[in-house]
Structures are given as structure tokens and as C-alpha cells.
């Protein structure tokens, strides 16, 4: 979509255990603890709650 802003920051989430990438450095402490998070749920709800991003921009994490 030409009206969408460019992606300015990405994180390779395939290099880490199953967890969302909000705090990759802090998350390394938890590497040995079995975690599962629904990143799609977290990315789509948290920014709207705290009002970080405009409503027309929806960050989505896709895990393979």
C-alpha cells in the first residue's frame, strides 16, 4: 500500500525461543524457561491500549 509508512525496524524472531520480541535482550534471560505467547494478540492489542501507534497501522508478527 503506497500510503503506508515504511518499516523502520525489524527483529529476527526465529533466532530466539517462542516469545514476543518486545524486549529481546531481557528475553534472553528467559531462554531456558518454556514460554508460549500469542504475539499476534499482543502486538495488536497493547499498542492501542497505551496509544502508541495510529489506528491505521497494525504491526503483525508472523511465526513459521
From Swiss-Prot:
Listed GO MF terms? hydrolase activity
Q: What is its main location?
A: other
Instruction: Name a single GO biological process.
Output: fatty acid metabolic process
**Its quaternary structure?**
Monomer and homotrimer.
What is the name of this protein?
Palmitoyl-CoA hydrolase
Which EC numbers characterise this protein's activity in its record? Answer: 3.1.2.2
Instruction: Give the family, as the similarity comment puts it.
Output: Belongs to the type-B carboxylesterase/lipase family.
One Gene Ontology cellular component annotation held by this UniProt entry: endoplasmic reticulum
The function of this protein is: Hydrolysis of a variety of CoA thioesters of long-chain fatty acids.
List where in the cell it is found.
Answer: Microsome; Endoplasmic reticulum
The protein's UniProt keywords, in alphabetical order, are:
Endoplasmic reticulum, Fatty acid metabolism, Hydrolase, Lipid metabolism, Microsome
Annotated catalysed reactions: hexadecanoyl-CoA + H2O = hexadecanoate + CoA + H(+)
EC class of the enzyme, as a word: hydrolase
